[in-house]
């Protein structure tokens, strides 16, 4: 969650993070003062539209931003109490895949078409556990493939011989073979049909319990979050605008207007309306940080102060909302 007092329980702690892309035309402000923390074993959903800053945040944690263009301008990223910003490449190489793994949106960006799937899972294990014997490594590879639902008899096949859902299973095997403490899953089910999507989410849930890993699930789909996560952080224009448990996000009458808009975009056969209600307008231009609330131009409740004054974060029972709507509530209390 964005503000957490029990620091010893936190596996990941991000404070006032600012990330930008320095292009030839302009500076793109992708993450703007973001705060986030994650406990050991927690399943956290990061929700927001394309361009909200979700993937940039994940790449920043692993220091995989595009070189020369991507830049962490300021802030802090601590992992298990240790500051990651400023760490040398050698340190981060040991961290990636071993303690923190990432599943990318397109499995083919992680798979080498010229190597068998067994070789690729084996290579990850060998990189982080070179002292294991070849037989020990092969046994672990076979077991991991079996855990993700791929028969060991197919480990000699190449990525193109597998369906999209099976490719994603292979990528999950590669991400978890070293038993990391944290898994960053970036839209792992986006390109899959509903049936396969449910299977992949169930697989991730089972493997999360098997290895006791914390998971950050990045998605634009609140329905997926409701199925998988314990807690949710809603991100808009590089900021956390709401954070709470799944129950708080969906059931509470108090919501950030952006969160309410996302929920209205979820198909629901019980509604009287025949059409979904998309959020009007577009994401704020990331080249220009607004003076007030970044959602003001799209908000149905926009007031004058929303355009001129940044909103404060309001908290109630751990439920956090960054919105002027709740200023009067707090003043009354």
What is each of the regions a protein language model found here?
Residues 9-10, 155, 245-333:
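Short catalytic/signature loops enriched in Gly
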Residues 72-83:
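Conserved ABC transporter NBD signature motif
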Residues 184, 188, 192, 196-274:
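P-loop NTP-binding/switch modules centered on Walker-like glycine-rich loops
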Residues 158-162, 166:
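Conserved ABC ATPase signature
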